[in-house]
Amino acid sequence: EYSPAGYAWIFPTSKNTARIGVGIGKPDSDVDPTVRLNELIDKKIGPIKDLGNIEKIEFHYGLIPNDGLSRKTVYDNLILVGDSAGQANPLVLEGIRYAIRFGEVAGKVAADAIKNNNTTEASLIPYEKEWKKAIESKINSAVKVQNRWVGLSDDEWDKELDIINELTADEFLDFIRADFGVAKMVKLATHHPKMVVRQLFNMVKGT
């Protein structure tokens, strides 16, 4: 209703300020996020109507990859890290944790390559092998879940959120981190046997 193929948010930052935003998945929707955000604010759609008079202070715009890990991340004299490498969690569309974590790995690999006077793709490949070993399966599983979520109606989303509300704090953190190891998914499906969780388990268990 508020943000096609994505989600909208209102995050209070003080008594009188808040961050209001929309995230719209491409190519699932051709809606312009800037146009949609202004429409929500100007027409006071949904929860925004409860905020009173709104004065726009700042505007920020960005792109976050959510198409999985289909790209190379090392070339001769070049290492890609963070968003440019596709290192983003498709479920919550954030990647700062990955950027920091694997930025350190990239720095160490690059330093060794420079020390050895060899910055070819072959000398930088240990970086790609390390980060893919750590999170490739998690992100690929999260993409499957995201693809399912994109097709949900608002009512189906409400049912999905009912399931998420039943999770413990640790289970929820694993979920939004896309930590879909088979052992954890079996435990999740056992503790929360509703059909939607079983569908989620079936979707990611083979990765």
Name what the model sees in each region:
Residues 4, 28-109, 115:
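FAD/FMN-dependent oxidoreductases across multiple families
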Residues 1-38:
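Conserved FAD-binding catalytic core of PHBH/FMO-like flavoproteins
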Residues 111-207:
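C-terminal helical "tail/cap" subdomain of flavin- and related membrane-associated enzymes
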Residues 1, 5, 67, 91-94, ...:
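Surface-exposed loop/turn and secondary-structure junction residues enriched for glycine/proline
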Residues 23-42, 158-176:
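Short secondary-structure transition/capping segments
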